[in-house]
Curated annotation (Swiss-Prot):
Ligand binding (substrate): G75, D76, M77, L78, R97
Residues given in the record as a divalent metal cation binding sites: D98
Subunit structure: Homotrimer.
Organism encoding this protein: Ectopseudomonas mendocina (strain ymp)
Identification of the protein by name: Putative 4-hydroxy-4-methyl-2-oxoglutarate aldolase
Origin organism lineage: Bacteria, Pseudomonadati, Pseudomonadota, Gammaproteobacteria, Pseudomonadales
Amino acid sequence: MHYITPDLCDAYPELVQVVEPMFANYGGRDSFGGQMVTIKCHEDNSLVKEQVDLPGEGRVLVVDGGGSLRRALLGDMLAEKAAKNGWAGIVVYGCIRDVDVIAQADLGVQALASHPMKTDKRGIGDLNVPVTFGGVTFKPGEYLYADNNGIIVSPQALSMPE
């Protein structure tokens, strides 16, 4: 499904919240959307690795890395695994790496920036907890839609207007 966030904002102004414009689009899909799975972690992508190994079922992984610009929470191997396992997209409040390869993956990816250094793997983080960044609280089970215009969230699934 191709999503256009301005059209969704126009059709559902009472439902959507718009994330502050700070993200760049790095993935092979320029638009994506789905039900959210959330992770809160800091410079440790152990939970990201665990989740992309699971069936994505068209969902979106939202990773709150605390906005850290010191380590990459997603690289090409995890992005390719997420695409293979049916994830619609990944939003990282932090950095990613291997951006040239990720741009070819059948996956939506938005992040703050790229950084070549990988994270430590200490098994630290929280899964499916509400996370807040960009002026919005992302709640597990709610919905996220993203394209080159921005990222929006909604408590319920949205359909593109006719």
